[in-house]
Amino acid sequence: PVVVNVMNAKLFESVNSTDLAKSLNYQSGLRVENNCQNCGFPQVRINGLEGPYSQILINSRPVVSALSGVYGLEQIPVNMIERVEVVRGGGSALFGANAVGGTINIITKDPINNSFQVSSTMSNMNGKVWEQYMGANASLVSKDNTYGIALYQSYRNRNPYDADGDGFSELGKLNMNTFGLRTYYRPTQFSRISLE
């Protein structure tokens, strides 16, 4: 048996998080740190072990490599996430070779009903640098529930941040646009074809 800690959308909203990297700091045993001032990549440490020892899954599939697990943490907007399941401790036999420190499983939103949401955030760091975020979600489902689609989009922009004025930025420049979808089709009551 393994212990699974779950982070849901209410947590993301209460801490005003815009991406997965900002959200993971609110889970015990996890720490997200910036390891390169030039390229600005964050990595997650589970139980103190570095990023390559953490397995990141999307919908229980290992689609994130060790490299994109480093750069991808800021590219996963919280507006596409239903919940995040965190398993601390070794689990290579269950989750994949990188799951030495632990596993982070990102469960994306499934189209359940017709909805639309737009959000925007603007934040400032020490009166020097502004960061803009804009996100949108939409989901459409047929009346008979045979097909549905969920779309998400996010945009983030941040200039480099030099906290101590030494000419090296502690946070690198960030200009990112993310788009994705999750869709399904049910030809019969007991079958489902999905695309993510």
What label would you give each PLM region?
Residues 43-45, 61-88, 109:
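Short acidic/polar hinge/loop motifs at secondary-structure boundaries
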Residues 21-62, 82:
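Extracytoplasmic beta-strand/coil segments of soluble accessory domains associated
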